[in-house]
């Protein structure tokens, strides 16, 4: 999976054409002199974006004239209620020779930095809220984009803060920076201050705008050196790109309809098929796929981040925003997924209503394509899940050497090299087998009860005993965010505590396994409840191992027996067909 | 001060494709029936207040799963944040009835450790002449899984209100008895909302603790 690569461009803060006192030249000069000695804050400056109802009222009374965007790009696309928006693009800079500001000098020319800054400063002059527009080279201001305080301008070009270049990005846990105790409180209150200096545009009905509020707020905080160790990509993946592609799609479609309505005499046909084709055959599905593939991992990562106080403050701040409609980040993250799954339904409706036969065929094939993309995605998600799960299993399942497994076997030190086993990697490889069922049970031994964890694969059953290790933390276990979301809660606890699952006995092949539920009357004598017996037979049908297992409830016991029985019969069947047919089985389609 | 709603319940509507999930939700939340369903892009869920007793309102947040029927590995994440669900099948489509079991198994795995209350809904009951599933067998299946069974029609607005309010009432009883509790980090049940406290974003920060009714 490739990360989103911003286009390579030099950093050039955008000029504020419309409001002369904020010309970039003067701004940059003053920036280098002294931050505290900055420009006057004109609350009613026409170029200033605001969410303040008072200000909007003032403006609507006629003091602020509506200004179109430079190049007429973004504002033209924006719905009418967004007219107060002033968009500046880097093209404007050409008109400002003085724009070679110290800001851009700070940045190496090869930087991948992508921010555009339109400044309206006051932060250091008075303690009022102020705003800066962070803009992207896509030349549009997206709704939900942030207005951030002017102080951000100083940080925007800092090479350490280039959010998209992994190598340069510092990963400082706060503890390393000595944020503890008193400092921690200060850190939190600083974070709150930082958030309070931030405002969000109140534009609605855009492409995943609520999600972008979260993403951009986080970006903003990171430019202020908060939450630097939070991985933006792991949370939001390619949201930026996805949002732009979706926006482009909706926008083109809207324009075609608009043109059709406006000049319907000259263009009798409504050619929206070309737009559908362009986007659905283009990057729209791919962008969604990339996002969705990351989705479950993102939700999991979010869960682990929620434990942090500073992250919690950030989340609350965003969630309290009106536009989030009392929704929380986990449910907002799912939005692009919903979108993708609705496209086939919409296309089907268009197909139904279409009267032109060639058009119908085109729409149908586009619909098929999207459905195929979804099916592929489903397959990929499953594959990835399984792959990651097995990787973790390889880590936590421990195979003790023969002499440790059974004390009968005496292997002198000098012979041990013969028994080097590479079992774990081969036997727990995702390409060879599937994990069907797993769970915690209690194994009754002659003198004690043992906590065991069973893995039922499609060809064998593995009985392991769980070992907790609360002192030593394994590297993989220290960051719960790195863990696989598809692992069961029990295994996650084991990993978190640096524990392991030690194999008790050799794997039991399903064709050598017998399972029987035990009559409650029989076993209650021994104080056993919900028990069942697993026997391991050798090639000669002699029993070589037996496990008396106890489940927490009768239901769990029944499920286990049913699962094992079903797995056995499936395995036997597949063995038979393998014997019967000399041809290899056809490859599974990606969706299964 | 009287709360606008006592609780917010999140419900999901599941079942095979074309059983009429979206239509049922639309009928309930918008009071209309669209001959051709138009999935609204950008609308992730629908909301409606339900009065279960005089003065006692519950806000329902209903998530439509239309289009996601074959996309389960990735949508399962939000099953777990629902407290209740309507499991739909089409009474004129035997197959959709046979899949009910599968749907239940699927959800059961993914809602853990929380629980979810289901009602089995036989939809499109206006098409009685084309019926392929008898009421008797549907009731038997529902009983086997401890669910209620109800037959609805979005087109003729039969039992749509009842399906949702009965489910809401059942969940409410469980919440009242303490069998279902509000939990941090779980979206299934949320506490109520009291009006006239929140005016602006600044105040939201201060009055973020909501009334626990």
From Swiss-Prot, chain B:
A lipid is attached at residues 211, 213 (S-geranylgeranyl cysteine). Mg(2+) binds at residues 22, 40, 64. The modification Phosphoserine is found at residue 201. Its main location: membrane. One of its GO terms (molecular function) is GTP binding. Gene3D superfamilies: P-loop containing nucleotide triphosphate hydrolases. Its EC number is 3.6.5.2. SUPFAM superfamilies: P-loop containing nucleoside triphosphate hydrolases. Residues 35-43 are annotated as: Switch-I. It catalyses: GTP + H2O = GDP + phosphate + H(+). The modification Cysteine methyl ester is found at residue 213. Keywords: Autophagy, Cell membrane, Cytoplasmic vesicle, Golgi apparatus, GTP-binding, Hydrolase, Lipoprotein, Lysosome, Magnesium, Membrane, Metal-binding, Methylation, Nucleotide-binding, Phosphoprotein, Prenylation, Protein transport, Transport. GO terms for biological process: autophagy; protein transport; Rab protein signal transduction; regulation of autophagy; synapse organization; vesicle-mediated transport. One of its GO terms (cellular component) is plasma membrane. It is found in: Cell membrane; Cytoplasmic vesicle membrane; Golgi apparatus; Cytoplasmic vesicle, Autophagosome membrane. The small GTPases Rab are key regulators of intracellular membrane trafficking, from the formation of transport vesicles to their fusion with membranes. Rabs cycle between an inactive GDP-bound form and an active GTP-bound form that is able to recruit to membranes different sets of downstream effectors directly responsible for vesicle formation, movement, tethering and fusion. RAB39B is involved in autophagy and may function in autophagosome formation. Belongs to the small GTPase superfamily. Rab family. This is Ras-related protein Rab-39B. It comes from Bos taurus. The gene is RAB39B.
